[in-house]
């Protein structure tokens, strides 16, 4: 089993994710510069947080049009897993690999703080080590993290089946007050139609060691590894 963490110009969470995967989760992981592409076979790819290309045009818009994303699409069409975190989630949305878009927060400021999430599904490659309804605590750090689903049609209906995480309060209540950025129905983690691509705004790598105050995010990565082990 081998993971790749793709580095774009402006990525700044790439080494954090690689450290958690390699050193904390024990998953062999390579840092891959985007111009090199996925030159070997990988079981999973992570697009990390940061500010790829300075977030010019729109967050993730330029990175989504780089050649390495052709490799990511091929992996997603097969049996591989793709996780996009924060800026990586924006890139996945811009690439059309998940439905909807991530746009400027309802209160248009950068938000950086812990957030509570409710696990909406535990039958996905990214959440299989959680239980549906679990409340987890993972930091957020974004200005363009407000999720908006497709305007109409089948893709809009698909979103209701593709929600992995919602913002909530400490007791699991999904309320307007627990929604830090104005996301539609508090959605902050959305899956592809096939379920093997996840875009999430919170940073699980920042909640993967006790010293960081929470280990809740580690189960995202360990779920991916477990899924690949079971389905290899």
Question: Predicted regions: what is each one?
Answer:
Residues 4, 47-51, 92, 175, ...:
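Amphipathic, alpha-helical segments enriched in basic
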Residues 73-77, 102-232:
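Amide-donor transfer/coupling interface in amidating biosynthetic enzymes
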Residues 1-85, 93-99, 104-111, 118, ...:
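N-terminal beta1-alpha1 cap of cysteine-dependent amidohydrolase-like domains
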